[in-house]
Amino acid sequence: MAESMQGLHRSHRCTEVSNANIGEKVTVMGWVQKRRNLGSLIFVDLRDRSGILQIVFGEENVGAEGFEKAGTLRSEFVIAVEGTVQKRTAAVNESLKTGDIEVIATSIRVLSEAQTPPFHIEENSKTSEDIRLKYRYLDLRRPDIQRNLMLRSNVLRVMRDFMANEGFLEIETPILCKSTPEGARDYLVPSRIHHGHFYALPQSPQLFKQLLMASGYDRYFQIARCFRDEDLRADRQPEFTQADMELSFVDIDDVIEVNERLLKHLFKEVINVDVEIPFKRMPWQEAMDRFGSDKPDTRFGMELCDVSEVVKDCGFGVFTGALENGGSVRGINVEGQAKMPRKKIDKLVEHAKGCGAKGLAYLCINEDGTYKSSFAKFMTEAELDALVAKMNGKPGDLLLFAADKNKIVWNVLGALRLMLGAELGLIDENKYNFLWVTEFPLLEWSDEENRFMAMHHPFTMPMEEDWDKIDSDPGAVRAKAYDIVLNGTELGGGSVRIHQDDIQEKMFEVLGFTKERAHEQFGFLLDAFSYGVPPHAGLAFGVDRICMHMLHTDNIKEVIAFPKVKDASDLMSEAPGTVDPKQLEELGIAVAAEEDEE
C-alpha cells in the first residue's frame, strides 16, 4: 500500500549527500535500484536522476515495522528515507560518487509500489530499441539517457544565456502556419471553422523571422520546434528542435562570427572542449570536388581526384563515354589496401551501385610496381602510369574510380570514402572539425519538375558578381548561403536574404512563379517588404544534432525524450491513431479507403 509523503521534505538528491554531511540527518527519495538482504541488515541502492546512494536498514535504527517494510522492497519501488549519514564501514565502492558514505535509515515510507519492469533499469541496456521505446517512461530512468537529456537541457540554457548577452530577443513564432509547398512535405492541420482549409506545422520559422526584421527587431532568436513529413533516418525525426536566429544590417561575415563564438562557448561550457575559431571555410564546388559531399568530414584524407584529363583519350569506353556525355572520371586512393580481398571489393562495387553508379573500376598497385586492374587491358602502360601518378599511387595502394555525371560520381565516391574511412579506422572520434561550406548554387535543376528550384529557399540572396548570369546561365549563379558542418554532419545553414524588390521578382520569375502565385503564397511577406525592410541574414542549426556530437552517438533518438521510430510512429502512445468519426465530421473530412495492392 502506497504511503503519503506528507510532513516530509527531501533535503538532498542522492549524490548531493557527501562527506560534508557525515553525522547529519537527511531525507532522500527515489527509486529502488537494488536490494540486498544480509539477515540483520538490508542494503538498498537508492536511485534518482543524480545517481545512486546506499541506504542501510537495521532493526535497531529503523524499528521492527520499518525493517519489515524494507524487506518487501523490490526494484523500482519509490521510497522516502530519513536517516543519518556515516562513513562506510565496509568496502568503499569506487564506481559511485557516493561510494564512501551511506545513510543509516531511521524511517522509511513506500510512496509507490512497482510491478516487475520489462527490462532492468541500467546503463547501456541491451534491450531492443522497440521495447525501450514502447516503455520509454522506464527507459528514461536509465542513467545514460538521463545524462543525455541533462546535457541537452544544459545546451539550451547556455545558448539562451549567450544569445541574451549578445542582444538577441527571444520571440516565439506561430506553430499553426500557412502551407508553402516549396520545401519538404508539410504536416497539415485541418481547420474546423474554415472547412476545406488547412494550417501547416512550420518546417522552420523562416517567413516569420524575416517579418520580425521588417518590424524592427534587429536581433531575433528562438529555440524553435519544427516539423517535416519526410523519410526518417538515424539523424532525422519528423519533429525536431533548432536554434533559430535572424539579424538586420549584417552580411555573411557578421552571422558567421557570432555563430562561431556561440559554438565555441557552447562546447567549452557544456563538455569542456576548446574549439578553435575562426572555422575553416570552403566553397561548395571545392567541397564537392575534394570530398564528394557538401557536408564533408575533414577529419581524414582520401580526397577525390579528378583524372578526366588523364584518361580522355584512353581505350576504356566506360571512362571516355562518361566524358563524352559531359561527366567526369574521378578516383580515391585507399592507401595500403591493394591486397583487399575480392569479396570486399565486390561489396564496394555493390555499395557504389546502391549510390547510383553503373559500376566501380579499381586498380591495385602491387608491391613490385605492377598493376592488377579491372580495366588495365584497355589502357597502355604509359596511360596507366600517368593515371597512377595523378592519383599519387604507390605500391600497396588500391585505387577506386567512378565515371558518370558529376552528381553521381560525387555521390558514389563520397559515400565510399566515408564507409572506408570508418572501416579502416581513419577517423579520430575525439576530433571536432567545424567547417563553413559557402557559395552554394542558388538554383538546382529538377528533372521531375522540369524547372529550376531554389537550393535553399526563394528568399536567398545571390552573389552580386553572378547576378548577370541569371538569364543566360541560372545554374551558375552562386548564393550568399552557408552551412555549418561538423564531422560530416550538416548542423544547420543560413543565408543572406533578398531585400530588394527587383531581385525578388526576378527570382520568382526564374523559379516559374507567376506574380499571382507568388502573391498567393507569400503575399504577406512581400507586402511587409514594401514598407521598408533592412538588409538581413540568419541561420538555424539543429539542437538534436549538436547534442549527438557532444555525446558521440549517431542515433538521434538517444537525445530526444519521446522520439518517433522510422515510420514516424510513437510506440509508447501509439500515435498516430484514428479519431472519433464525429471529429472528422466537424472538420469536413472523409477518410478514403485504402486501395488493395495487386
Swiss-Prot record:
Top EC group: ligase
Residue span of region Aspartate: 206-209
Gene3D superfamilies with a match to the protein in the record: Bira Bifunctional Protein, Domain 2 (3.30.930.10), GAD-like domain (3.30.1360.30), Nucleic acid-binding proteins (2.40.50.140)
UniProt keyword annotations, A-Z: Aminoacyl-tRNA synthetase, ATP-binding, Cytoplasm, Ligase, Nucleotide-binding, Protein biosynthesis
Binding locations of L-aspartate: E182, R228, H456, R497
Cellular-component GO terms for this entry: cytoplasm
Subcellular location: Cytoplasm
InterPro entries in the cross-refs: Aa-tRNA-synt_II, aa-tRNA-synth_II, aa-tRNA-synth_II/BPL/LPL, Asp-tRNA-ligase_1, Asp-tRNA-ligase_1_N, Asp/Asn-tRNA-synth_IIb, AspRS_core, GAD-like_sf
PROSITE patterns in UniProt: AA_TRNA_LIGASE_II
Chief location of this protein within or outside the cell: cytoplasm
GO biological process: aspartyl-tRNA aminoacylation
Catalytic activity: tRNA(Asp) + L-aspartate + ATP = L-aspartyl-tRNA(Asp) + AMP + diphosphate
Recorded GO MF terms: aspartate-tRNA ligase activity; ATP binding; catalytic activity, acting on a protein; nucleic acid binding; transferase activity
Positions contributing to ATP binding: R228, D229, E230, Q237, E490, G542, V543, D544, R545
Transmembrane segments: none
Domain of life: Bacteria
Enzyme Commission code: 6.1.1.12
Recorded family membership: Belongs to the class-II aminoacyl-tRNA synthetase family. Type 1 subfamily.
Function: Catalyzes the attachment of L-aspartate to tRNA(Asp) in a two-step reaction: L-aspartate is first activated by ATP to form Asp-AMP and then transferred to the acceptor end of tRNA(Asp).
HAMAP family: Asp_tRNA_synth_type1 (MF_00044)
Assembly with partners or alone: Homodimer.
Protein name, as recorded: Aspartate--tRNA ligase
